[in-house]
Every structure is written in structure tokens, then in C-alpha cells.
């Protein structure tokens, strides 16, 4: 009974393949046919196929014969022969797309013409003037792009270093004005290291104790003038002559008179 059921399922599978290839619709069973099929399935009776089996076709397909048995194809039926030809081509040569379909696909896309660089017209190059930047302006722009902790830039381009002293309730302590932002940042690092030790957040941690000299501060003109006076000669005070308050038009004549009085000589 199991062999009969297998052959029926194989036949139904091949029939569905044939109908799919030929574009036919699935047959609609009537009520009487459906009831007979249901009764035969319940009672275990086998349903006879419509077409007879031809063993000559199954000899060409050993793999089909091993799994499905003989194929239910008729030699006199044109539809069965069409199915046989399709299966034969698929078994021996494999499925290959037709050349006509590939040609149609190629013709559906527009042709693209690729031009070589030689076909392009030569374009005259326009000379571009390169603006020369001075090293001072380049250094200023580079310094503006980077910000250091505890450093503020003055409006005139110099850099001031400041730090908040925790001993003075976070008041700002001015550390000086420097030429570059790096010098101001280094001055801040050294002041922060002296106040907070290893807990301080530094700009250059490796340069704090490297033995570098202290950055040079920018001194104001007033302080530099006072320091030069302290180190040099004393200040010159303006002295007014005895007759400074007189009118310019008044002239004073002085005469020297020698008077001899005994042994002494008096000059008046």
C-alpha cells in the first residue's frame, strides 16, 4: 500500500510540473470526484492514474527512477513529449537562459558613450595669486586656535596667566603677562603645582619639573622706567635761580670794588 501511495504522490508532483510549464490551471474536482477520492483515501484503495507508465523514459533518468520510479509519460501525447524534452535538457545540459532574452535586456538599457581625456577641450589655467602670510600673523592665528588652562588673551595680543588660590576662597591671582600662550600656560602649571601638588590639572605635566628656566614676563613701561632709575643715577631736580622771578627786561649791573683796610682786602 505504501508503494501505491508513493507512486500516486509522484504522479501528482509531475502533473503539477507539467501544468506549470504549459500554463494550465489546476483542475477543479466535482463533488462526486472529491467524495470518491476521500472515500478511497479512507478505505485505503488506490487511484489509478490517467496515463499509462512507459519504462523507456525512466531508463534515461536513473536518479528519478531511484526516488520516484517510472515516469507517467505517454509517447503519443504531445504535452508529455514537451515535458520530456524539458526534463531531458535540464538533466543533461542544465538550465541556460535564452540568448534572445539576454539581447532584449541589453537593448533595454541606453548606450553610454565614454569620452577619452583627449577629446576634452583644453582649458586655460587662470593664475592664482598666493597671499604671503607673515610668520608673526601665522603664530598669532596658531595661538588663537589652542586654548590653555589658566590663560587669557589680551586685546592687544599678549597672554595673561591667572590662577585661583584656594587659600583665598578661590580669588584670582595674577601671575603675569607673557608673549606666547605656551609661556603663560607654563607659568600657570608651576603655580598650580606649588599650590595643589600632584592633584593639579596641568597643561604640560612633563615640563613642570624638567628644569626649564622660568618664562619671561612682559614688564610695563612704567615699571621698567622706575627700575632703571633705581639702578642708575639719582633723579635730577630742577633748580630755580635766585633771580628767576624777575622780569626779563630788567638788567642788574654788578661792580667789584676793592677796599684796603689795614692788612685785609675787602671785595664788594
Curated annotation (Swiss-Prot):
GO biological process, one term: phloem or xylem histogenesis
Keywords: Activator, DNA-binding, Ethylene signaling pathway, Nucleus, Plant defense, Transcription, Transcription regulation
Residues covered by region (Disordered): 215-244
Short sequence motif Nuclear localization signal: positions: 221-237
Induction comment: Induced by Pseudomonas syringae tomato (both virulent and avirulent avrRpt2 strains), independently of PAD4. Also induced by methyl jasmonate (MeJA) independently of JAR1. Ethylene induction is completely dependent on a functional ETHYLENE-INSENSITIVE2 (EIN2), whereas induction by wounding does not need EIN2. Induction by salicylic acid (SA) seems to be independent of PAD4 and NPR1. Transcripts accumulate strongly in cycloheximide-treated plants, a protein synthesis inhibitor. Seems to not be influenced by exogenous abscisic acid (ABA), cold, heat, NaCl or drought stress.
Alphabetized GO MF terms: DNA-binding transcription factor activity; transcription cis-regulatory region binding
InterPro entries the UniProt entry points to: AP2/ERF_dom (IPR001471), AP2/ERF_dom_sf (IPR036955), DNA-bd_dom_sf (IPR016177), ERF_plant (IPR044808)
Signal peptide: none
Cell location: Nucleus
Pfam families, per database record: AP2 (PF00847)
Primary localization class, coarse: nucleus
Biological function: Acts as a transcriptional activator. Binds to the GCC-box pathogenesis-related promoter element. Involved in the regulation of gene expression by stress factors and by components of stress signal transduction pathways.
PANTHER family named in the record: DNA-BINDING DOMAIN, ETHYLENE-RESPONSIVE TRANSCRIPTION FACTOR 1A
Free-text comment about domains: The AP2/ERF domain binds specifically to the 5'-GCCGCC-3' motif. The affinity of this binding is higher if the seventh amino-acid of this domain is basic.
Name of this chain's protein: Ethylene-responsive transcription factor 1A
Organism this protein belongs to: Arabidopsis thaliana
The encoding gene: ERF1A
